[in-house]
Amino acid sequence: LTNIFILRQGFRQELIRKKLLKSQLQPFLDEIEVEIEADTLVEKLSSFERLVVELLRAVVADYRLIVMREIGTLVNEGELEKIHAFMKHYAKQGFSFLYISPHFEEILQICGRAVVMSNGKVIKALAGEQMQAQTLNFYSEEYNAKVRHHIESLKERQSNKIVFEGRHLCGDVIFNFNLKVAQGECVVIQSLEEGIFRDLYLLFQGEKQDEIHPGTCYLEGRTTKICGDRGIAFIREEPTETMLFYDMSYMDNLCIAMDHRVKNIWGNRKMKWCIRADFEEILGENVFDKRMQELTEMEKYDLVYTRIMLQKPKIVFCVQPFKGADLRHRIHIWELQEKLLRKGIAVVILAVNMADALSLADRLVRIDKGTVVTEYQRKDFGMLPRNIPWKALYDENGRI
């Protein structure tokens, strides 16, 4: 209620009359058939409800141009379809929308025109009959080719060795969740409910593990605590902002997860020199002498993922790894994750929307209402909803 009415420009009431404001809000909610308690704190709203609040705030303020930026990374495909329906509803009332997304599948669902941009420049403007998947996919052909090659190469490196197992994991929302992950396997876990995502995030990061669940985790057959086990790595959401230490050197950032492998790594100049010699060709000769603030986004991603490779974990948990990345950076992140898989490291991706994660997945687990709803093997990906990215690479039998 506060966000929609009181914080908007032009609100002039000196006394806040909540009852009156609630009565003014209800017609807007009824119009789009959404139920949200007006007194609910924003921090307790789901991502979908927050998007609705943002949209209603713009509508109530009569902002005629509304920018929707990468909303597909915040909600699942069912909720995304509802948001699209709201946008179409308000578009008929004269509101205009600027929809920013890295995924052509989303653009085709909602937009009447599209502009393809790269390095701040317009490459192509599309409208009418040009708004087809074949036309738009032309601009991501490099990405598509890499995905196809990855899918084909999977046949050569299948493994049945289980490296991680979680039994009877529970949280505030999750109940009795079981998970097995094989060596070099990529598993995508899609949470269809806000609380599930929060539970899984805390579980995989190892925060408050004893409080979150009474279940047991096993790494290569031995019981383990996720937090502090160097055989398990965790890549946070937007890692270039959340996993780098800008008051430390590039080399110290790179070696920070090697303390279990090399004694006194911080004072071992010879080892650091060897690491530099080994990785200069891969990372670049100049990055080791740069200040952290001088690194490009690509160089930051290289640093994060190379640090993980030096840690040599058996499994890596990633939270929405492609969030906020444009096509160029998505390709690079995809390549880095594919490199982990080729080294036999298992990758578990936690996502709200499958998006690019499906292009790497061997298996998809969808969770709703605290338990597994559906599990798809790669051969079943052709049965996924038609608007899912990369679904076009599979027919109904899961073949390329």
Residue ranges of predicted features:
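Conserved beta-strand-loop-alpha-helix hinge in the C-terminal portion
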Residues: 121-144, 371-397
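ABC-family P-loop ATPase nucleotide-binding domains
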Residues: 1-57, 237, 242-307, 311-313
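Flexible loop/N-cap segments at domain edges
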Residues: 161-296, 306
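Flexible nucleotide-interacting loop at or near the entrance of a catalytic core
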Residues: 119-183
